[in-house]
Amino acid sequence: MLFAAPGCTLPQGDTSIGDSQTGVKDLVTESGSDAYAIINNNIPDFTESDMQSNVFEHYSDLDSLGRCGVAYSCVGTELMPTEKRGSIGNVKPSGWHSVKYDFIDGKYLYNRCHLIGYQLTAENANRKNLITGTRYLNVEGMLPFENMVADYIKETKNHVLYRVTPIFDGNDLVCRGVKMEAKSIEDNGDGICFNVFVYNIQPGVHIDYATSDSYAE
């Protein structure tokens, strides 16, 4: 079974879905403590025509509930930040709620999570790029993939097609997780190639995704 293209190493703790027909909707209904699951044998859904090395970034408009949509970019050194990240405290994504649990590292259940990490495109307080995500989603789920892409670009000066899609169930204000896809362009995925669903969960906490209310399990 394909987990990664040659030369591409996944972060530890992956859960392979196996059946390439298993979709994101199926993953949303699954439970468990894994940070992410592999989709479509780890092959992203980009087309041949998508594989262009011209840098760009696109962030979908917020919907009627104030929720983010797809964030999509061809990432290269041209887009990466040249200064430290500023404050994002003025942005309150859909479902934003400040709540603490003593057993969570940093205490806070929710973070303002960038769909495309600041280290990749230097987008900071962009409301179209920030969701309400758990500490676990942010640090254990998304960050290892972001770091992998950033390190690859810095080392090779190549470009990576990168797309993150928040998945909401109905009118929920908090997404169930995010679909992350990436593929390196110049080497046709030999360096970076993944397609994963990262769960917006926090071990030990039950989350009401419709409202963002929560309680310790």
Model-predicted segments: where are they?
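C-terminal motif of bacterial Sec signal peptides marking the signal peptidase cleavage site
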Residues: 3-7
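N-terminal, intrinsically disordered, polar/charged segments of Gram-positive cell-envelope systems
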Residues: 10-55
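Domain-level detector of nuclease and nuclease-like folds
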Residues: 46-217
